[in-house]
C-alpha cells in the first residue's frame, strides 16, 4: 500500500491510498457488499454508474456461505465477483457477536453459532487472517473484542486488553505469512476500542498505533451513543493516530456524521445506511432526506434531487419512484440504491475538492445551510 497525504484543511485530510487493485482518493465512502454484492446492484452499476474504487465485504458471512475456500477456488473475491477494484473485508467479529444467539469471547477468540444453521464455530486472530487470505481482500481487519454500550469500565478494560493481545498476535502472524509469500499484496488494519471513555481510547490507540499495521480504524461507535459523544470520541482518538497512515471510522453513518468526522481527520467510512434506507423508501438529497413513499410525491415530476447527476435523477421523476416503491417493483430497489450511493460518493468527492482548496469550513457551512 502506498499512502500519500496530499492536503489538509485544518484537521480534514485529502489523501491517496494505492492498493494492488485501485487508487483510492479520500475522503472515501465504501459501499457495503456484505456477501460480495452491493444489494440491488450488479458490478457494472458499482463501477460505471458509481465509480467506486473500493467496496466492503464481510468475513463472517463469506466464511459461512459460500465458504472462504470456495471463494479462493473461484479466483478470490476479485475473480468470484468480477469487481476489479479494491476490497476491504471486516474481520467478522461484530457479526459473530451480534448475529449469534450464543456468542462467547475468551482470551483465545470468539465462539459463536451460525445464524444460518446453528453450527458452532470459533474465530481466533489467526483464523480470521487465514480466511481473509482466502478471500484475497486488499485491506483486512483484525479480530477485535467488541463491547456493547453501555458497558462497565471493567468490561471495556478487558476489551482493550484482549484487542491489543489479538492485534500483536495478528500482526506477527500476518507479517510471517507475507515473508512466506502469502498475502504479499494485502494490507492489515487494527481496530481501536474503548467506548466513549477518553482514557480508554487513549490507551487502546497508544498500544495499537505502536504496532506495524498499515492503517488504523476506530471501532465500537455508532452503537447507540449520542452524536456529540461519537464526535468527541473521534476528535480525541485521532490525536493518537499516526498522520502517515489511513484512518477508518467503522460503521458510520449519516451524511452529517461523515461531514463532522471528516472535519475531525477521518479518511474512510462504511455504512449500510444508504443502501438499507433506499430499500425502505428514504432517499438522501442535497436538501435533506426525502421519504419517497409519501403521497405528496404521487404526481411530483421533479427528480429526487435537482442537484444530482445520477442515472436515477437524470431519467426518472419522484412520481415514478413513488409508483415503483408502492408497487414493490424490483426496479425501484436498483434505482433508489444507485441514487443514495451516488449521493454519498459524490459528497465525498466534493469534500475532497474543498479540502484541496483549503475551504472545508465553507463547504461544511453550505452543506448545513441547504438543509435549513
UniProtKB/Swiss-Prot annotation:
InterPro entries: TGT, TGT-like_sf, tRNA_ribo_trans-like
Keyword Magnesium listed: no
Gene Ontology annotations for the cellular component aspect, listed alphabetically: cytosol
Annotated active site: 90 (proton acceptor), 270 (nucleophile)
Gene3D superfamilies: Queuine tRNA-ribosyltransferase-like
Annotated positions binding substrate: 90-94, 144, 193, 220
Xref: Pfam families: TGT
Record keywords: Glycosyltransferase, Metal-binding, Queuosine biosynthesis, Transferase, tRNA processing, Zinc
Enzyme class: transferase
Catalytic activity: 7-aminomethyl-7-carbaguanine + guanosine(34) in tRNA = 7-aminomethyl-7-carbaguanosine(34) in tRNA + guanine
Pathway: tRNA modification; tRNA-queuosine biosynthesis
Cofactor (UniProt): Zn(2+)
One record GO biological process: queuosine biosynthetic process
EC number: 2.4.2.29
GO terms assigned for molecular function: metal ion binding; tRNA-guanosine(34) queuine transglycosylase activity
Residues the entry annotates as binding Zn(2+): 308, 310, 313, 339
Matching NCBIfam families: Q_tRNA_tgt (TIGR00430), tgt_general (TIGR00449)
The protein's role, per its UniProt record: Catalyzes the base-exchange of a guanine (G) residue with the queuine precursor 7-aminomethyl-7-deazaguanine (PreQ1) at position 34 (anticodon wobble position) in tRNAs with GU(N) anticodons (tRNA-Asp, -Asn, -His and -Tyr). Catalysis occurs through a double-displacement mechanism. The nucleophile active site attacks the C1' of nucleotide 34 to detach the guanine base from the RNA, forming a covalent enzyme-RNA intermediate. The proton acceptor active site deprotonates the incoming PreQ1, allowing a nucleophilic attack on the C1' of the ribose to form the product.
Family: Belongs to the queuine tRNA-ribosyltransferase family.
Entry protein name: Queuine tRNA-ribosyltransferase
Gene source species: Sulfurimonas denitrificans (strain ATCC 33889 / DSM 1251) (Thiomicrospira denitrificans (strain ATCC 33889 / DSM 1251))
Amino acid at each position: 500500500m502506498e499512502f500519500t497525504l496530499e492536503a489538509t484543511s485544518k484537521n480534514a485530510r485529502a489523501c491517496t491510498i494505492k492498493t494492488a487493485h485501485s487508487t483510492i482518493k479520500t475522503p472515501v465512502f465504501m459501499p457495503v457488499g456484505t456477501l460480495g454484492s452491493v444489494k440491488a446492484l450488479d458490478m457494472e452499476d458499482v463501477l460505471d454508474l458509481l465509480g467506486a474504487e473500493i467496496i466492503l465485504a464481510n468475513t463472517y458471512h463469506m466464511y459461512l456461505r459460500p465458504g472462504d475456500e470456495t471463494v479462493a477456488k473461484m479466483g478470490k473475491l476479485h475473480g468470484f465477483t468480477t469487481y476489479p477494484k479494491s476490497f476491504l473485508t471486516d474481520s467478522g467479529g461484530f457479526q459473530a457477536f451480534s448475529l449469534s444467539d450464543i456468542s462467547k469471547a475468551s482470551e483465545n477468540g470468539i465462539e459463536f453459532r451460525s445464524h444460518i444453521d446453528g453450527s458452532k464455530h470459533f474465530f481466533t486472530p489467526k483464523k480470521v487472517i487465514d480466511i481473509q487470505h482466502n478471500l484475497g481482500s486488499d485491506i483486512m481487519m483484525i479480530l477485535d473484542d467488541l463491547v456493547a454500550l453501555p458497558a462497565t469500565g471493567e468490561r471495556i478494560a478487558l476489551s482493550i486488553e484482549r484487542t491489543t493481545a489479538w492485534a500483536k498476535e495478528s500482526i506477527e502472524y500476518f507479517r510471517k505469512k507475507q515473508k512466506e509469500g502469502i498475502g504479499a499484496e494485502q494490507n492489515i488494519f487494527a481496530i481501536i476500542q474503548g467506548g466513549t471513555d477518553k482514557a480508554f481510547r487513549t490507551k487502546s490507540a497508544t498500544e495499537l498505533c505502536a504496532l506495524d499495521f498499515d492503517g488504523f480504524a476506530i471501532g465500537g461507535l455508532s452503537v447507540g451513543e449520542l452524536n456529540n459523544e461519537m464526535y468527541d470520541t473521534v476528535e480525541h482518538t485521532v490525536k493518537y493516530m499516526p498522520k502517515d497512515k489511513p484512518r477508518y471510522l467503522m460503521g458510520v453513518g449519516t451524511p452529517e456524521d461523515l461531514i463532522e468526522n471528516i472535519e475531525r481527520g477521518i479518511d474512510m467510512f462504511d455504512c449500510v445506511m444508504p443502501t438499507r434506507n433506499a430499500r425502505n423508501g428514504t432517499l438522501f438529497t442535497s436538501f435533506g432526506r426525502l421519504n419517497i413513499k409519501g403521497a405528496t410525491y404521487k404526481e411530483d415530476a421533479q427528480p429526487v434531487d435537482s442537484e444530482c447527476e445520477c442515472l436515477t435523477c437524470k431519467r426518472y421523476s419522484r412520481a415514478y419512484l413513488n409508483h415503483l416503491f408502492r408497487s414493490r417493483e424490483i426496479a425501484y430497489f436498483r434505482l433508489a440504491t444507485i441514487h443514495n450511493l451516488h449521493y454519498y460518493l459524490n459528497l465525498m468527492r466534493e469534500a475532497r475538492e474543498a479540502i484541496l482548496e483549503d475551504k472545508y469550513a465553507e463547504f461544511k457551512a453550505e452543506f448545513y445551510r441547504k438543509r435549513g
